[in-house]
């Protein structure tokens, strides 16, 4: 996801420096070229050799290292960097960067960088909450740095409070949001639905389907990475919530309808990827239904057709896309759905096609519009998500 990107990781002298090694490793696994620059104090907590083994690149500490190629190294590094992140950032380094001090390799390089810059302060709670530190962080924000708020918990000093460096996985999400994709959805509001619904029979049992939510979650993440403000209305899934996405958890088809109806008026693009129940029990038992020797018939009633509602109540300029899971006559049924629902695009797939079933990480999608049919090959759901978004914004 970060192939072709150069990430500059600045490591300063705090106990959380060990987490920077895990961050470097994670970025390398995402195919980024990771350059590391350390303060001398940072080398007291973790050795440059650790980062060199993880990244396959020489670590910079000394501004006047005579072993580097003949060039102004901090300028050369700043020019080829796509993003700089300082993690952990001590109070001292935050102060230096806020006031333009450049007395070592890290601060000198940071001053020369014109790429997106992230900083993750990590320190004792009292130091973090000190008005001087807060003023310095606000200055950094004014100068274009994105400040990643520290986590709360037990600190190395024994105190409990705010000041922990976030976990590497969270830091990676900030980096991905900043540089992983072009921001062609910046300024757009995108509403996604995902997952199954559950229609209760009694306090114990419910009617549901096999949807894992993976496709909808992939679309939500892709839209976020492309700069959109994303709202995800999701049924029950086992998938962690995507970073930087507003998540609305629902259970039943009626709950999904109410959430979608509330969010839809402000959305520029709506993609309904959820597998919503078409029918729900007419009556929900107050207590667990006991089995008997006779057969059981459960009367069902129609749920609200959410996609049709969206098509009938769209605002001007709004793009609406639905999904169609079929087992036969996929194109014919999906074209009919496109017309009947009054939407702009149907993303159709065939449950019987290899790689396109429930719960898998791939999909085979056909994008159907009023005047076009585009057959996508077998792809990862992440790549399918990007293809859907690209087609949608062209409508």
Where are these regions (language model features)?
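A cross-family phosphate/adenosyl-ligand binding-site feature
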Residues: 1-118, 124-213, 217-395
């Amino acid at each position: 996801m970060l192939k072709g990107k150069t990430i500059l990781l600045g490591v300063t002298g705090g106990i959380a420096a060990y987490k920077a090694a895990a961050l470097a490793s994670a970025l390398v696994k995402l195919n980024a070229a990771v350059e590391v620059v350390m303060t001398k104090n940072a080398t007291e907590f973790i050795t440059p050799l650790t980062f060199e083994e993880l990244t396959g690149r020489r670590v910079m500490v000394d501004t006047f290292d005579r072993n580097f190629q003949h060039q102004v190294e901090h300028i050369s590094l700043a020019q080829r960097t796509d993003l700089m992140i300082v993690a952990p950032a001590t109070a001292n380094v935050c102060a230096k960067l806020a006031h333009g001090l450049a007395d070592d390799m890290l601060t000198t390089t940071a001053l020369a960088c014109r790429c997106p810059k992230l900083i993750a302060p990590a320190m004792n709670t009292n130091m973090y909450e000190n008005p001087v530190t807060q003023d310095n962080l606000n200055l950094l924000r004014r100068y274009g740095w994105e400040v990643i708020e520290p986590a709360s918990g037990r600190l190395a000093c024994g105190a409990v409070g705010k000041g922990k460096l976030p976990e590497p996985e969270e830091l990676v999400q900030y980096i991905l949001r900043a540089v992983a994709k072009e921001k062609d959805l910046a300024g757009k509001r995108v509403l996604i639905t995902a997952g199954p619904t559950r229609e209760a029979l009694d306090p114990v049992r419910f009617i549901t389907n096999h949807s894992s939510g993976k496709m909808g979650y992939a679309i939500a993440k892709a839209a976020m990475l492309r700069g959109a403000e994303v709202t995800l209305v999701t049924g029950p899934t086992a998938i962690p919530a995507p970073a930087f996405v507003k998540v609305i958890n629902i259970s039943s088809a009626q709950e999904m309808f109410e959430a979608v109806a509330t969010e839809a008026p402000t959305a520029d693009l709506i993609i309904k990827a959820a597998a919503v129940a078409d029918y729900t029990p007419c009556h929900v038992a107050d207590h667990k239904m006991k089995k008997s020797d006779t057969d059981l018939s459960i009367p069902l009633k129609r749920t609200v057709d959410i996609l049709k509602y969206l098509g009938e109540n769209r605002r001007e300029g709004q793009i609406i896309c639905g999904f169609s899971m079929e087992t036969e006559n996929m194109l014919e049924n999906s074209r009919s759905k496109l017309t009947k629902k009054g939407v702009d695009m149907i993303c159709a797939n065939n449950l019987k096609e290899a790689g396109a079933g429930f719960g898998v990480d791939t999909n085979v999608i056909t994008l159907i519009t009023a005047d076009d049919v585009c057959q996508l090959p077998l792809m990862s759901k992440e790549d399918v998500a990007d293809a859907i978004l690209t087609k949608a914004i062209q409508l």
